[in-house]
């Protein structure tokens, strides 16, 4: 079933600002330990139902996907260009931000944010959780419009952590997106979702303390250009779908899937990150060089102005990332704007109409006269390496559907034949169990690194430990 959520009316903005200030003050009394799972979700609103293929939920959010301005990482441009002319290279950006929403319905049907407050017990003679002096900053990892990420070390247990320091605005208080990220992540316990250890609130900042993960999928692909080892692609994709299935069953969307938001540990574990930190913005009518990359993984329904978001939104991003891992280039690397992005999609999948995508003509930005009329192609014509891997093209084709209702759900994708050669025990793991606890499940050396990573009897992930990110 699909749950539709109506947006809040504009006249509530004033009340929302007052609520932000109240919640900001409440954060000074919140200090959560690693094992505290009682921090509740915030936003509450009405739900109705809708259908989507597999097991999906449609959500119409309070806001839309954010644009990020982060640390740059250079990526390769696809050679499959519908305009058949050279274009300037686009640089991908690393993001600390994105929005993700979980909504519940109150017994009265009215919208009323709720926060349950907890403080963490601590010894007066030892470093405390929830205190800024409990962590040592080691180096800056990235900086966004209102948040900075540092590599840090816990003085409590000596473990490495990632510190997201969010600068607070006096008038607005704690940003709802930061509250949302904290509330969601404290309730999500899964091996393939980044773990939130602690929350620190001061007058000027709100700091979210995460487990430290060595690199992300974007950097990993930059380090291994030309496409990843097929076995590693399968393990990364399996973990991505595992994490998404977990949050989708809880009516949570990630809404900003891209390689920069998928962390890779030194043992090869993939973890979903960046839940709700960014400020929300409208889908832009134009973009700038450091924003254009965020369009690469955005589905055509959103590009065309749809605001009825479902778990199918995330599944489009999965398809794009799957193709990129195999082919070694982004699936749809638009170079200019939304129009260009849609042209690249339609060149491969065909220009939609009411027969292939019922309801497309009602989308705000769909103007048939603006688009070249393309016929759909086999995906291997665009990305030839899909044909080298059993069942890869079929799975990609079921994820990269223009009509959101036709996209495979995360749970259904896990049962696809593409994964049929993996050990059955992978489907029996508990949520917090890593896939690498199953015998014989391990990453393979990427091209050219066998001697470097395995010749000295080292674990695979040690080659990543010196990555700067």
Curated annotation (Swiss-Prot):
Originating organism: Homo sapiens
Known EC number: 2.7.11.22
Bias (Polar residues): 456-469
Gene expressing this chain: CDK14
The protein's name in its UniProt record: Cyclin-dependent kinase 14
One Pfam short name: Pkinase
Activity control: Serine/threonine-protein kinase activity is promoted by associated cyclins CCDN3 and CCNY and repressed by CDKN1A.
This protein's record includes keyword Cell membrane: yes
Effect of mutating residue 432 to I: In an ovarian mucinous carcinoma; somatic mutation
Catalytic activities: L-seryl-[protein] + ATP = O-phospho-L-seryl-[protein] + ADP + H(+); L-threonyl-[protein] + ATP = O-phospho-L-threonyl-[protein] + ADP + H(+)
């Amino acid at each position: 079933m699909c749950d539709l959520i109506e947006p809040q009316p504009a006249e509530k903005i004033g009340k929302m600002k007052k609520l932000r200030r109240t919640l900001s003050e409440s954060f000074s009394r919140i200090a959560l330990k690693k094992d505290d799972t009682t921090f509740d979700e915030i936003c509450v609103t009405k739900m109705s139902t809708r259908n989507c293929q597999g097991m999906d939920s449609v959500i119409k959010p309070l806001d839309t996907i954010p644009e990020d301005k982060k640390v740059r990482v250079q990526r390769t441009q696809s050679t499959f260009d519908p305009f058949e002319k050279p274009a300037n290279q686009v640089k991908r950006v690393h993001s600390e931000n994105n929005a993700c929403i979980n909504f519940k319905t109150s017994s009265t049907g009215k919208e009323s944010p709720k926060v349950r407050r907890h403080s963490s017990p601590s010894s007066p003679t030892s470093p405390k959780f929830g205190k800024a002096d409990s962590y040592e900053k080691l180096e800056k990892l990235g900086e966004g419009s209102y948040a900075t990420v540092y590599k840090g070390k816990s003085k409590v247990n000596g473990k490495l952590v990632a510190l997201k320091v969010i600068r607070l605005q006096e008038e607005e208080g704690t940003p709802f997106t930061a509250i949302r990220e904290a509330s969601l992540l404290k309730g999500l316990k899964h091996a393939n979702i980044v773990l939130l250890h602690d929350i620190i609130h001061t007058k000027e900042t709100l700091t979210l303390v995460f487990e430290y993960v060595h690199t992300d999928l974007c950097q990993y692909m930059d380090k291994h250009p030309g496409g990843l080892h097929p076995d590693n692609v399968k393990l990364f994709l399996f973990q991505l779908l595992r994490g998404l299935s977990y949050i989708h069953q809880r009516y949570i969307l990630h809404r900003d899937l891209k390689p920069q938001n998928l962390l890779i540990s030194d043992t090869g574990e993939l973890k979903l990150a960046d839940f709700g930190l960014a400020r929300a913005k409208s889908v832009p009518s134009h973009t700038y060089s450091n924003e254009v990359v965020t369009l690469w993984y955005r589905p055509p329904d959103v590009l065309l102005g749809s605001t009825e978001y479902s778990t199918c939104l995330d599944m489009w991003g999965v398809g794009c990332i799957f193709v990129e891992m195999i082919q070694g280039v982004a699936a749809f690397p638009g170079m200019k704007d939304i129009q260009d992005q849609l042209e690249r999609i339609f060149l491969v999948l065909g220009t939609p109409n009411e027969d292939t995508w019922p309801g497309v003509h009602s989308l705000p930005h769909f103007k048939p006269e603006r688009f070249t009329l393309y016929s759909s192609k086999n995906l291997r014509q665009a990305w030839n390496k899909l044909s080298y891997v059993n069942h890869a093209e079929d799975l990609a084709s079921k994820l990269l559907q223009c009509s959101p209702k036709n996209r495979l759900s995360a749970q259904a994708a896990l049962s696809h034949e593409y994964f049929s050669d993996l050990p059955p025990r992978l489907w029996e793991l508990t949520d917090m169990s890593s896939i690498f606890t199953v015998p014989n499940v391990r990453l393979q050396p990427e091209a050219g690194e066998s001697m470097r990573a395995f010749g000295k009897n080292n674990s695979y992930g040690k080659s990543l430990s010196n990555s700067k990110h």
